Amino acid sequence: MRRISDLPNVVAMKVTGGSSIALTIQAFQLCGDRILVSDPMPDRWFFTIPKYGQQWAGAGPFYCMQTPENPRIVRIFDNLIKGEIDKAMDIFWEMSRPGPQGSLADSYFHTGIVTALTDKYAHWCAGGNGGTVRQPTGRLYDYQKDGIRAGMKALGITPREPEEEFYVGRVNYAKGYRLKKYEA
């Protein structure tokens, strides 16, 4: 891992969300003095920011936990940067009360199949474009969508409607695109 930071065009490294904490710590210890290292998982920031000086979050499903009116994740990160851990913790627990959303709502990691479709759905519910992911992908079940929508509502986020908009994408839906009706 240290050799990555020797490459002249490498300035940062994102430790994939959901990986082991040991990998996160090792990445900061081996590369953190030479390149910017990021773990995108908010619960890890409580030690990666104060101990290792993490400066950025990398990509993650933050959109399903905040809105422009209430940027919870941004506030957590900013408070941790300022050393205001108690304030960050209050926001974290407020956000965690309803239970996890997106991919964490029904952890597909246990299935051995990793798909971003639940995260895409949660993003769409919070105002994102939606649209499905490339094939092959897993199916998004009604109970998963119901759980994501319930979590959104508990956070004070009104999920988007109609469902069809998710599948074609918000932008395409606004242009008049609709799902094709397939007959058996």
Which residues are covered by each model-predicted region?
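C-terminal alpha-helical cap/extension of soluble enzyme domains
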Residues: G60-A184
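Catalytic alpha/beta core domains of metabolic enzymes, predominantly
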Residues: M1-T111
